[in-house]
Design a protein with these regions (language model features):
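C-terminal motif of bacterial Sec signal peptides marking the signal peptidase cleavage site
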Residues: 19-22
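Extracytosolic ligand-binding ectodomains
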Residues: 2-6, 14, 24-408
């Protein structure tokens, strides 16, 4: 069954209804007592530490979702309240945060954090309490091999598949025109490594030789030695399994060594609005997979972009959109089932409904396999004439793919 809500108070509205306030202090939300109080939603996010930049983007998306829904009639006719805790990018902290949100604060629902590293322990806590767990940013394969029957990833594709359209385009080239060598540098993070190594697998299958393969700790700031290895290799392609600041620092280091790859692809960072300024505006030709673009012609996306841009002054990026999508997915289930409380029966009904249905969202129609993997694909974006544009697949392209990156 496919769920499409076209009226204003539809999935979009239902997916934007959180006000940043406190939750209840008892083990059971007071909203359960009379059925017309606020629905409380608990979230832990990395607002400080290694993942703080994208974590704040997810926070902005959740808060915008909250405001919109509350301005448009609420969820099940009730306002929602959002409680956000800072997990400091720490896996132990995120687990204790969700324990507190569920067991002490008595939230009715939970939304997931940012990054695979934090999603896995958070999802385990949610599973232990029987809670539905929809998350915006845990895309690595290890998320889906833990036996989480309560988890749904609110984006189009898992990390290993993010570069599939780019790999297809390279494979379609005459063999003489394909790159011959590639260098890989990935953060020691399941998502970041998944994106880079998913493309690595495809390129190696085509005969592209791996000449550098580096994994670095999440707190790495000095990329001098890694950049030197890549520059010395003269690799045709550089693939960065990155989040944000690591990509910026890596690119700056590579430019300082005058390394000029024919193709450069980095995960996450290039879709961030601050990225061009951070690397000195030398962006032309840089590639990145994305699960979202403001220009996408999906139901409710234009309204989302208009609302978010008016509220924040800038269009939404991928992190904000995935957070909004998380709200849309949960809201669709809540409205369909007719409940939003921590009772195990209600939570199981929400889980079961999402297992059987497709939901239209701002990132496209989403459906999931039994482990919570979305059954879609990521777009490929590239900086063309100073703007980041969709270049793959061809049917969605806003600009032609630049096969050989200009010097940076």
């Amino acid at each position: 069954m496919k769920v499409t809500m076209h009226h204003r108070l539809g999935v979009l509205a239902l997916a934007s209804c959180l006000t940043l306030t406190g939750c209840m202090s008892s083990g059971s939300s007071s909203s359960d007592d009379d059925g017309d109080g606020p629905i409380t939603i608990g979230i832990s996010l990395p607002l400080t530490g290694d993942f703080s930049e994208p974590g704040k983007g997810v926070q902005r998306g959740y808060e915008a979702w909250a405001d919109y829904v509350n301005e448009n009639g609420g969820l099940l006719g009730r306002d929602v309240e959002l409680k956000i805790l800072d997990d400091q990018s720490n896996a132990d902290r995120v687990a204790s945060d969700y324990e507190k949100l569920i067991n002490q604060d008595g939230v009715d629902l939970v939304f997931g954090p940012f990054s695979t590293r934090l999603v896995v322990p958070a999802a385990q806590v949610a599973k232990d309490y029987g809670f539905l767990f929809v998350e915006p940013a845990g895309a690595a394969e290890e998320v889906f091999t833990q036996g989480f029957d309560n988890l749904f990833y609110a984006a189009p594709a898992v990390a290993d598949d993010h570069y599939n359209y780019l790999a297809d385009a390279i494979e379609a080239l005459p063999e003489a025109d394909r790159p011959k060598t590639a260098a890989y540098a990935a953060m020691d993070d399941p998502f970041a490594m998944g994106t880079a190594y998913g493309l690595k697998t495809r390129l190696e299958e085509m005969g592209v030789k791996t000449v550098v393969d580096e994994v670095y700790p999440p707190n790495t700031t000095d990329f001098g030695s890694i950049a030197a290895k890549i520059a010395d290799s003269k690799a045709d392609v550089i693939v960065g399994g990155t989040q944000y600041q690591d990509a910026v620092n890596m690119i700056v280091a590579l430019r300082q060594l005058n390394y000029q790859p024919k193709m450069a692809a980095f995960s996450t960072a290039p879709t961030n609005a601050e990225f061009p300024e951070a690397i000195g505006k030398e962006t032309e030709g840089i590639l990145s997979p994305t699960g979202y673009t403001p220009e996408a012609d999906y139901p409710t996306n234009a309204e989302f972009v208009e609302y978010y841009t008016e509220k924040s002054g800038t269009p939404p990026a991928e992190d904000e959109a995935n957070a909004w999508t998380t709200g849309q997915v949960v809201a669709a289930a809540v409205e369909a089932v007719g409940c939003a409380d921590p009772d195990p029966e209600c939570q199981q009904q929400l889980i079961d409904w999402l297992r059987e249905n497709e939901v239209d969202t701002v990132v496209g129609p989403l459906s999931w396999d039994a482990e919570g993997r979305p059954q879609g694909a990521h777009l490929i974006q590239q900086y063309v004439d100073g703007k980041i544009r969709i270049v793959l697949p061809q049917e969605a392209a806003e600009a032609d793919l630049i096969l050989e990156k200009p010097p940076w």
